[in-house]
C-alpha cells in the first residue's frame, strides 16, 4: 500500500485536476492514485497514516455534495462515514479551491470545514498557507491568520497555481517523511 492517500471531491473537475497533478509528482509506492470520495470508503481512508484531502467550496460556502448539485455526492455525504475513524495517528494536508472575487465572504470555507472535522478527530494538520496575495473578506479556513492548507483560485489566479503547488509540496514533504 502507498504511504500517502489523496482524496478529493469535485464538482467542475478543477479539484480533481489538482489532485491528479499532485499525484503525478510522486511514484505509486509513495502516493496512491487520487480518488474521488464518492468512490472511497472509510476503511480505505483509515488505512493511511498520511492523507492529502482536497475540496472546492460550493453554494453558500458549503462542502461539495448532493445539496450543492455535486453529481454522485461528495464530502457532504462522505464525512459522516468517517465519523468513527481515529485520526489521532494521521498527518493530514489540505488543499482547497475557491473564487475570491465572486465569493469573498465564504472564500474556501469548505476547506475550513474539512480542517475542523479532522482536527476534532485528532489529526495533525500540516501545510498551513499564508493568506497574503489573496483578496477576500472572510474565510472559515483561516486559523491564526493563515489558511489551514493550500488555497488555489483557478478563476482569478490560475497563473500562480504551479508555483504555489511546488512551494506547498516542498513544505509538506518533510512532514510526510519525503525528501524536499
Located regions from the model:
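N-terminal beta1-alpha1 ligand-phosphate binding loop
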Residues: 2-26
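FMN-binding flavodoxin-like domain, especially the glycine-rich phosphate-binding loop
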Residues: 3, 14, 29, 47-180
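A short beta-strand-loop structural module common to alpha/beta enzyme folds
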Residues: 29-41, 129
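Structural motif
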Residues: 42-46
Amino acid at each position: 500500500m502507498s504511504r500517502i492517500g489523496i482524496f478529493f471531491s469535485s464538482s467542475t473537475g478543477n479539484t480533481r485536476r489538482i489532485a491528479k497533478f499532485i499525484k503525478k509528482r510522486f511514484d505509486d509506492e509513495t502516493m496512491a492514485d487520487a480518488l474521488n470520495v464518492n468512490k472511497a470508503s472509510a476503511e480505505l481512508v483509515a488505512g493511511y497514516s498520511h492523507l492529502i484531502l482536497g475540496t472546492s467550496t460550493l453554494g453558500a460556502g458549503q462542502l461539495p455534495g448532493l445539496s450543492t448539485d455535486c453529481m454522485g455526492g461528495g464530502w457532504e455525504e462522505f464525512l459522516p462515514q468517517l465519523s468513527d475513524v481515529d485520526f489521532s495517528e494521521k498527518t493530514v494536508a489540505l488543499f482547497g479551491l475557491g473564487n475570491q472575487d465572486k465569493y469573498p465572504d465564504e472564500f474556501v470555507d469548505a476547506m475550513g470545514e474539512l480542517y475542523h472535522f479532522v482536527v476534532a478527530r485528532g489529526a495533525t494538520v500540516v501545510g498551513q498557507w499564508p493568506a497574503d496575495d489573496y483578496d477576500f473578506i472572510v474565510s472559515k479556513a483561516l486559523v491564526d491568520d493563515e489558511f489551514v492548507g493550500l488555497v488555489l483560485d483557478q478563476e482569478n489566479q490560475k497563473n500562480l497555481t504551479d508555483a504555489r503547488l511546488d512551494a506547498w509540496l516542498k513544505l509538506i514533504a518533510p512532514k510526510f517523511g519525503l525528501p524536499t
